[in-house]
Amino acid sequence: MANRLLLLAAFLVAALPSQAQFFTGLRGTPYAGITNVNYSPAIAGSPWMVDINVIAIGANVNNNYVGLSRYALFHSSAFSDTNFQQNYLHERVNGLAKSGYAGLQVQGPLSFMFQFGPKNKRTLNAIAFSYHGNFISNVDNVTEVLARTAYHGLGYDANNITHYVNTELSNANLSIKSAAWIDYGITYSRVVINRRENQLKVGGTLKLLQPVSGAYGYVKNLSYKWTEYEQLNIYNTQVNYAYNNGMITSQGNSDIPAYVKQGLQFKNGPPTVAVDLGAVYEWRPDATKPNHEMDCKCIEAEQVQRYKIAAGFAIMDFGALRFKRGDYSRNFTADIRNWDVGGADFPDGLQSIDDTIQSRFKVQPGKKYFTVWLPTRFNLFVDYNIWKDFSVNFTALISQDMSPKRDMLHQVTTFSVIPRYEIKWFGAYVPLSVDVMGNVGLGLTLRAGPLIIGTQDLLGLFVKKHLYNADIHAGLKINIPYHRTCPKNGDIRFSKKG
């Protein structure tokens, strides 16, 4: 039983919210192009005439409870240690509820953007098409007593730590949700104001959503008591429970390729839509000042378009996924006494859980479909050009489960300061970030020609004793910049000094 509960704890950690921004270092920079369409759809004004994605992937996990020893990260033999938990895992005990996140996003090949406009306003409009494979899993609001009891396993050791036996316990708003989906988006952005030193650009993305897999569970008020080490009472607790039809289980589809194919054919749920909206203001105090003396030098497009301060706001992923409910996934009321969970066994995975629910609890009739809301978030940034090619970006990602039923996916509210150096074919970005779960990260992203690679946190690799979060992102693109604007014969650009 202790081993099963340890696996449960490991699942909570792996599925638990993180610093879940993808490509954090590129947020706010105009050089991100199509990569930033997931941060703000206001992409007009980019230095790139055309930006085509070959492949881009971002993955991260994070939790605020169990840390992995940095030693184990670099020594695979540690994972075969019979005392792995004691030697290489570390609990963060602070009395707070435990949460975590796992996320993956892949921007599909040939996602692209291009800009067009009059000769003297070549970046007036931008159009993009992009598609992404997405996966997010959240576990939220696990009380420290429940988390530690699961981590140490029912019995003397856990009780000696948490004193869970013969104690009236509760857990409010406990939730777990997970979804995989594909989105196909068309983006339009335009510079709507361009007067002297002031520029305002806006953008929007309309997305078609393809649900692949989804599940959630939510307990508003869990009330329970352990009368013995492995004997449980649960008191009149309402549980919302759903997973999509065809979920991989002995009662559904055990053929993974067939299951994925079913999802891609909209058999797991109908298509729905979502929208992104964004705006960026730029202040260019030098826009009306002559900046070229009597010469015939060509002017780089990005030199003409440089701003001193930019500020942006976007609301992303406003929409929801709809799934066909599995036949055995129903809301239920748990009200049971003296349940010997030590003898509980789940040999058939999800089917065994369903069988237990059907036999022990009062199951309620369910609707044919259930909803999982997308991770709606608010992105804000202020970007300041310090000097020439050196800038610093202040960004906030605000995301939380705002649904009363706790069926909304979410990222983790994170605040970042990102110093950077960038020119057309190279950029170095150093994000310093802190999230609401108390995790601090110092990362590095490099952009070298068409290649982007980085991580949100290098501290875990070189400084931190234990890792609570990990992130990696990489991309390969085809960038086509604007050609230089050069004077023609008889068109000599000059201005007087002063």
How would you label these PLM feature ranges?
Residues 1-25, 498:
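Bacterial Sec-dependent N-terminal signal peptides
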Residues 21-498:
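Subset of outer-membrane beta-barrel
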